[in-house]
């Protein structure tokens, strides 16, 4: 039986393993090695003597398989949100960017613009009202001066509508009327008896104002004591005339029916010595009280003319006064000459 068996040598098991990066290649290598090992084991069963050797080879093959190390890498995909275009489940705005800021800025700008317009309108209305009030006040003051300091006289004010339409019309008309007024005479130092009733009556019949050596025309400043010289005699005469006028207005029956006999003589207007043309009109005699050349025309020409011609002393006094007037010149004469040259 032993001679009939042919002893054959055991096939040599040669295993080769390779480490791959991916887990799939390692598993394929292991499966190939396992298949080859199974085929070797199945072939060993035919020979009993070689069992131990084959078992050692199988065990060495299994230890070799256990030493295989595998590596694997995980790749994470990127996450992208779904598109909102034509997606009913995602809400998207159709307005442009910054709409909220534009709306808020427009509201704030409108508020500031309204406040600015309101301020401009109120400022303009206030300016117009102030201008009208100023013109009205100036017109009232002007009219009160023209009416003698009484702003409540009849016809001193115009209609309010005419004031607003043309506030300067009344000024023009008043200036025109005042420029057409006649010149009033002034009273300086009257004769020896300044309290004569006949002379006072003559002065009452004429319009008189306070003595003003600078201005010849009456204006609204005539009642003010702005001049350098004020005649005390004139002050007394005015006070007496005002008292007499008040009595006459209270009792109109006391008015004289006929003027006095020497009315024409008394109606002679008093003249100033400063005017050159007035010197030629009437002779100037020396004052008997203050020894000055300021004098009116003689009051009684009819009765005193003959005495003046007959008495040589009076003629001498007149000559002396004329000589004094020729050589002496008062400061007011220089001032009057300057004013007349300006006019």
From Swiss-Prot:
| Ranges of compositional bias, category Basic residues | 281-290
Q: Kindly list the residue ranges recorded as spanning the membrane.
A: 101-121
Give the compositionally biased regions (Basic and acidic residues). Answer: 269-280
Keyword vocabulary terms for this entry: Membrane, Transmembrane, Transmembrane helix, Vacuole
Cellular localization per UniProt? Vacuole membrane
Identify the InterPro entries for this entry.
PRM
Q: Where is the composition biased (Polar residues)?
A: 254-264
The record's GO CC annotations read: cellular bud neck; fungal-type vacuole; vacuolar membrane
What membrane topology is annotated for this entry?
Answer: Single-pass membrane protein
Locate the region Disordered. Answer: 45-65, 235-343
**PANTHER family, from UniProt?**
CHITIN SYNTHASE 3 COMPLEX PROTEIN CSI2-RELATED
- To which protein family does this belong? Belongs to the PRM5 family.
Q: Any idea what this protein is called?
A: Vacuolar membrane protein Kpol_1003p17
């Amino acid at each position: 039986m032993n001679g009939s068996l042919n002893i054959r040598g055991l096939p040599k098991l040669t295993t080769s393993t390779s480490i791959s990066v991916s887990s799939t290649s390692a598993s394929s290598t292991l499966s190939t090695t396992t298949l080859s090992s199974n085929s070797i084991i199945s072939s060993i069963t035919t020979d009993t003597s070689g069992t131990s050797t084959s078992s050692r080879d199988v065990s060495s093959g299994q230890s070799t398989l256990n030493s295989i190390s595998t590596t694997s890498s995980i790749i994470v995909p990127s996450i992208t949100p779904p598109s909102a275009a034509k997606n009913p489940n995602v809400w998207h705005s159709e307005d442009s960017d910054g709409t909220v800021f534009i709306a808020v800025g427009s509201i704030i700008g409108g508020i500031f613009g309204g406040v600015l317009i309101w301020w401009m309108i109120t400022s303009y209305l206030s300016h117009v009202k102030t201008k009208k009030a100023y013109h009205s006040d100036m017109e009232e003051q002007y009219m009160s001066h023209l009416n003698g300091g009484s702003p409540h006289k009849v016809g001193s004010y115009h209609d309010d509508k005419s004031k607003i339409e043309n506030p300067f019309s009344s000024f023009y008309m008043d200036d025109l009327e005042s420029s057409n007024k006649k010149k009033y005479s002034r009273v300086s130092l009257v004769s020896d008896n300044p309290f004569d009733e006949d002379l006072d009556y003559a002065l009452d019949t004429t319009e008189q104002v306070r003595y003003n050596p600078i201005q010849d025309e009456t204006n609204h400043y005539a009642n003010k004591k702005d001049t350098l010289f004020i005649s005390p005699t004139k002050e007394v005469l005015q006070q007496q005339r005002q008292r007499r006028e008040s009595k006459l207005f209270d009792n109109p029956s006391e008015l004289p029916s006929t003027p006095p006999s020497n009315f024409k003589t008394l109606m002679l207007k008093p003249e100033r010595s400063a005017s050159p043309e007035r010197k030629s009109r009437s002779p100037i005699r020396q004052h008997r009280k203050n020894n000055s050349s300021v004098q009116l025309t003689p009051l009684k020409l009819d009765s005193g003319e003959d005495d003046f011609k007959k008495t040589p002393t009076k003629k001498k006094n007149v000559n002396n006064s004329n000589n004094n007037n020729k050589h002496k010149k008062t400061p007011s004469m220089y001032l009057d000459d300057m004013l007349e040259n300006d006019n």
